[in-house]
Amino acid sequence: MPPLEGAYGRGGRGLLSAPRLRHGTPERAGLDPGELHLLVREVHARTAGERPWAAGAVVVAGRGPVLAVQEAAGWAVRYAAYDEETGTAVELPPAARVPMTVDTPFDLASLTKLFTSVAAVQQIERGTLGIDARVGAYLPDFTAAARHGVTVRQLLTHTSGLRPELPLYDCADDAERLALLRAEPPVGVPGTYCYSDLNMLLLQHVLERVTGRTLDTLVRDGITRPLGMTATDFGPCPGAAATEDQRRPWAKADRGMLRGEVHDENAWALGGVAGHAGLFSTGRDLAVFCRTLLAGGSYGPARILGPDFVDLLFTPPGLGFALDQPWFMGELAGRGAAGHTGFTGTSLVLDRATDTYLVLLANTVHPRRRRVPDNAPRADAATRVARAVRRT
């Protein structure tokens, strides 16, 4: 295994084989142990008490090939329901609760978009997909996107002009859902940023049309299986952290307390496999994903992307990835940090400038979603990692 020395500046770029993750001390990772101790303590504090930020959480952080923090806090399942009349959570008896562990899978929500984006860039690398090609060249039956000249790049950068979402969960069947997607025109000016789940749904259809394979197969065969991410897949996932007592009026469907079934209503309506949501994973598996991208697309003997195409992913404004967003990246933002958040409480950040990564998975929607999400704990955790680098 290559030594740690020199890995931080290079990130493993250009290596035919990149080192795998291994557990180690903060000092071995080149991180300040005091800051990481505070990171862990704060995650525990935010899962404690009567009204915690999240019922439970898993935090994973490291630098280079060294995994320096892997900690679980709180509960994977704490609540039986949400009481609408009293506006309070209904606690399970202590014996019926399920503790959080570092191996607990989470509903990734929009972190799924990162895997869809990597799958797309893999096809760009192979020459089967053109980044500036028009969607209509691959999906002529998606008449609205074809008529307005929407491009693959616009889907990946959320600049297609498509609205944030459609009520696919209210459609009678798959045929009606597909007809709605095919007929949906941009409502904004193409080239203007507007975050939209529809971009990734159209991209899913492009990928499936180009390859003749379903998205779950593309992700499994092209990303998770080569990297040994055995805990990452589309649901159902029975052992996952619970999400929401999903009921109207605060949600868009009446499904009750969810555990192991995709939380996103549109992904659920689409059968659990969707370009914008549907994956489940663990903190360690996502650390492998981050490490692979930091190492230029390689992990051990596996290579999922070439270094130039990892660069393409992270070229501003980013393909699928958000870049330098302090609202959830804290002080890691500023030198090309990349990442994403998920509605269920998930997030990850990787910083190529310092060869560091942070995965924070929390079930913040258990037992009910907040009206306004609280992103401060995500930013605070990332700031701890940034300071752990600076103080070494």
Where are each of the predicted segments found?
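Short, conserved phosphate/pyrophosphate- and ester-handling motifs at nucleotide-, phospho-/glycolipid
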Residues: D32, K113, T282
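A short, well-structured edge-of-sheet supersecondary motif
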Residues: E35, R41-P99, I131, T157, ...
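Active-site SXXK
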Residues: H37-H44, P65, T104-D132, L203-E208, ...
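Short, well-structured active-site flanking segments
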Residues: A68, W75, A95-D103, F115, ...
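Short, gly/Ser/Thr-rich active-site loops of penicillin-recognizing serine hydrolases
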Residues: E84, A295, F309-P316, P326, ...
